[in-house]
């Protein structure tokens, strides 16, 4: 399949850019796989590059999707291949103001967010299928 996204590793550092002796891939056990990434997300936006043709299908992100990077990564997987580059190419600074938290909310909150993610992904993939069928019918007409 065609590569739709690339994800690279990053060295985790503190506020003073001192290494915390861990990379984002180690922290998140990063790799491709829909269910793996529903359980523990590998996709961090600053470490991702996404093919423009994929973004045309992935965007817009639904309002009820809280983790935008995960949405993009999971849908890129649905469209084709996601390649993971093991080399840390940037520093990923951890500090009190990070949007990505090291801890999760309640188990109920996590389940609800994942449920909404799965439902929205299913809806989007069905939209793609319908759109592709309509385009195919248009092409087949004499």
What are these regions (language model features)?
Residues 49, 105, 109-142:
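C-terminal, non-catalytic tails of nucleotide-sugar-dependent glycosyltransferases
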Residues 20-27:
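Short, flexible, mixed-charge acidic loops at enzyme active sites
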Residues 1-20:
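Conserved donor NDP-sugar-binding/catalytic core segment of glycosyltransferases
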Residues 13-17, 40-47, 83-84, 117-129:
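Low-complexity, flexible helical/coil segments
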Residues 27-104:
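Conserved nucleotide-sugar donor-binding catalytic segment
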């Amino acid at each position: 399949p065609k590569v739709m996204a690339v994800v690279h590793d990053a060295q985790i550092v503190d506020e003073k850019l001192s290494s915390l002796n861990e990379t984002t891939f180690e922290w998140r056990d990063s790799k491709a796989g829909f269910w793996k990434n529903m359980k523990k997300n590998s996709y961090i936006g600053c470490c991702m590059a996404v093919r423009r043709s994929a973004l045309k299908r992935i965007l817009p992100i639904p309002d009820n999707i809280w983790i935008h990077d995960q949405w993009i990564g999971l849908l890129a997987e649905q469209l084709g291949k996601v390649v993971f580059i093991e080399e840390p190419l940037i520093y990923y600074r951890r500090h009190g103001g990070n949007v990505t938290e090291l801890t999760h909310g309640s188990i109920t909150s996590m389940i609800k967010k994942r449920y909404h993610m799965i439902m929205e992904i299913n809806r989007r993939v069905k939209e793609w299928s319908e759109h592709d069928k309509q385009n195919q019918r248009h092409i087949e007409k004499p």
